[in-house]
Amino acid sequence: MLLVHAHPDDETIMTGGTIARYLDEGVDVRVLTFTLGEEGEVIGDRWAQLVADGGADQLGGFRIGELTGALAALSPPGGSPVQPWFLGGAGRWRDSGMAGSAAARHPRALVNAGFDEPVGVLTDILESFAPQVVITYDSAGTYGHPDHKLVHEVTAAALARVAASRPEQIKVYESVTEHSALQAGLVAAARRVPDGWRMPGPGELPSYPDAMVTAEIDVRTQYDRKVAALAAHATQVTVAPSGTEYALSNNIVQPIFGHEHFIRVDAAAVAGPRETDLFDGIG
């Protein structure tokens, strides 16, 4: 299984439980991250001077440590933890920041990479690792981040190249939030909003209609490890005292889900009951 993400913390927020579950099942799980997340907004004062804009520009290196800690938390206790893996090597491409930010003008920003280069690097990884399942973002980049959208596009292009030479079908999934799961989580969260946090406004958190979701993975057994992994990304994520919600630097309440949701998008996807195992149908 290969999970393709843009920045450290995306892997845990979107797919942390799924990573932990399949590691528990003995699957060879690799987490590939495109950038170091140099443009992340730091929570609190302790590490605030690591930022790029007006600071030491050391946040990316620090976040490698956070990602390492998060993957260790997601890994089965007593075993060898999953190690971070960066496209082109750590630091090859840089976090582009949000749309319209000055960070997008940096010469190493991911959005300035010639499209063929990251596609070629990812194609080589797909050919050498030969995953049976690939997980990434939807075409909107989950919430519109330019790097997330580019990761989606690069992944789709690399998969298309591999399909031309590899007869085995790769199951491809986009990680999404199910609408009813989000609403249920927010109803529960409204009873325990931490001081200084706020509930999201209507439509502020993206979600998909339930009918579009094709796979639902039960990660309740791995839930505590997912929470620990979120806490490992301390510059970016605050976990509520209840352990049931988290917030980014904007202090907007977001539920921590015990089920993670996906939409299958490869050519062999067919309508039918929701999958409960992403390896269904793989011999």
Swiss-Prot record:
Record keyword Zinc present: yes
Signal peptide (from-to): none
Gene Ontology molecular function: N-acetylglucosaminylinositol deacetylase activity; zinc ion binding
Top-rank lineage group of the source organism: Bacteria
Keyword terms, alphabetized: Hydrolase, Metal-binding, Zinc
Family matches, as PANTHER family: 1D-MYO-INOSITOL 2-ACETAMIDO-2-DEOXY-ALPHA-D-GLUCOPYRANOSIDE DEACETYLASE, N-ACETYLGLUCOSAMINYL-PHOSPHATIDYLINOSITOL DE-N-ACETYLASE-RELATED
Record protein name field: 1D-myo-inositol 2-acetamido-2-deoxy-alpha-D-glucopyranoside deacetylase
